[in-house]
Structures are given as C-alpha cells and as structure tokens.
Amino acid sequence: MSESAELTELYSAIEETTRVVGAPCRRDTVRPILTAYEDVIAQSVISFRVQTGTSDAGDLDCRFTLLPKDMDPYATALSNGLTAKTDHPVGSLLEEVHRQFPVDCYGIDFGAVGGFKKAWSFFRPDSLQSASDLAALPSMPSGVSENLGLFDRYGMTDTVSVVGFDYAKRSVNLYFTGASPESFEPRGIQAILRECGLPEPSDELLRFGEEAFAIYVTLSWDSQKIERVTYSVNTPDPMALPVRIDTRIEQLVKDAPLGSAGHRYVYGVTATPKGEYHKIQKYFQWQSRVEKMLTADAG
C-alpha cells in the first residue's frame, strides 16, 4: 500500500469515527497533520479519544505513539505550521526532557477540530524516571517541586513513565505507573484529592479507582497546585466498568472502526475543581511492542 493510500485510509477512519461520535472533522486541519507525520504513521500506534464535560468534549482527539526517539514531534509541528512558536516555557520543556532523560519514544495528540495539541515523552517500563529530577528542569512548572512531598507519601516519585506537554492549554502531565497500592484504595484516593484541594471523590470514582493501574496529574505554570488527577483503567470491555457510560463514549466503543487493534481501550476518570469527567481512548492501529508500554499509555 502506498503512503498516500495509507493516509487516505487513515483519514477515512478518522472521518468515520467523528461521524459516529457526532463531532466535526475538518479536512484542512487533519490532512496537514497526517502529511507532516506521514513517514512514521505506519510504525506508530494509533488511537482515538473522546471525553465528557470539558471544553474539548465536542472534539475527537487522535493519538500517534511509538514515534521514534530521534524525532522531535514538537519541532515537526512547528516546521509544518501546525502550531505557533511560543516563548512560554511549555515550548522548551520537551527539548529539556529529551536532552537530560532516556526517552524511549514520543507521541502526539491532535483534534479533528482543534488541530495539534500535545506531545508525549515515554520512558521504558524498566527505566521509570524521578519526579525530583524532572522538577529540576528549568522549564518545568514549580508545582512539581511543591508537590514532591505528596508524590513521596504515595510511592509515586520514582515511577514517572510519561511526560505530556499540552501546548494548547499550556500545562504538563506526569504519569505514574508504580504508585503504592494505597493510592488506588478509597481512603488513598480521598486523601490524594484532599491534599490537592480537589472535591471529595464520587462513589463512582472510588469504585473505579480500585481497578486502575495508573495515576496522572496535571500542572500548569499559573499555579503551584495540582489542577487535575486522573485514574486510568486498561480494559477490553469498557461497558463492564463500574461507571455510568456517556452516550458519546458508548458510540465510540460500539460503532467506531476497529482497525487492527481490536477491542483495546483505556478509560479514565478525572477529578477537577469543578467536578469529575470521563474519557476513553480506543486503539485503532496496534504494534506488538506496545504490550509492555501499555501501562504508560494512560489516556
């Protein structure tokens, strides 16, 4: 199959998935992104994501992971005019992480409406990194340093598997895949959210958290507080999870194209100052190498 045919097939899958979940699909937004990353799409893992209750709820997000470590995904976005260059620290953080840490591969997120949004740096499961070391980077939000005590208390500090860079919202995600068992128990979830100044978790989140394998936190440069905490679950059957399934999530699960990945999903519940929202990531294109990384690819 030629590269152009491959892109046409992928665009058709994105377009069909947006139709299924009732989201727009802007060809003039999506096609330039596919073209910019054309050389690495065949070897990547591809997934589609929807969420509820946020400013992004009307968009379909697409994710490419397993991008090669010698590729700077943000530089590619800049050179292809997919995002504007910025003097904000978010614009230099990925390069700092790449220069000082053993990044194994990269990823990107883009919306069928919103365009290029995020990049990701993945560490190998046998080479998890320290939040203390990441906090020392010049461009890292100071909130990482301010919350090292919390990370220590719940066995999270030395278990960072992914760093996410949200260029659209100017925030950072730290993914922890080795937190203490207590972190997933109802008391632990309540304590973590309380320390973050977030509302008490719903009973739904407490039940869901007991099945989770990873936690990630969102921080920005505007505050030293953790803005959001997300618990993630790997599942072949999201409909069986102990949560109320939103209509758009159900549509993605039941009606969107399967691709080569079959029935593979990551479901997340996020706690915010304004309440909780849900998200789901449906894998479309699979690579066998991702099996060991799946615990790090947490929605």
From Swiss-Prot:
Keywords linked to the UniProt accession: Antibiotic biosynthesis, Prenyltransferase, Transferase
Reaction it catalyzes: 5,10-dihydrophenazine 1-carboxylate + dimethylallyl diphosphate = 5,10-dihydro-9-dimethylallylphenazine 1-carboxylate + diphosphate
One annotated GO molecular function: prenyltransferase activity
Database matches in CDD domains: PT-CloQ_NphB
Xref: Pfam families: PTase_Orf2
EC identifiers of the protein: 2.5.1.121
Pathway in which the depicted protein is active: Antibiotic biosynthesis; phenazine biosynthesis
Domain of life of the source: Bacteria
Regulation: Does not require magnesium or any other divalent metal ions for activity.
Swiss-Prot/TrEMBL GO biological process terms: phenazine biosynthetic process
Role: Involved in the biosynthesis of prenylated phenazines. Specific for both dimethylallyl diphosphate and dihydro-PCA.
Family: Belongs to the aromatic prenyltransferase family.
Protein name: 5,10-dihydrophenazine-1-carboxylate 9-dimethylallyltransferase
Taxonomic source organism: Streptomyces anulatus
Lineage of the species this protein comes from: Bacteria, Bacillati, Actinomycetota, Actinomycetes, Kitasatosporales
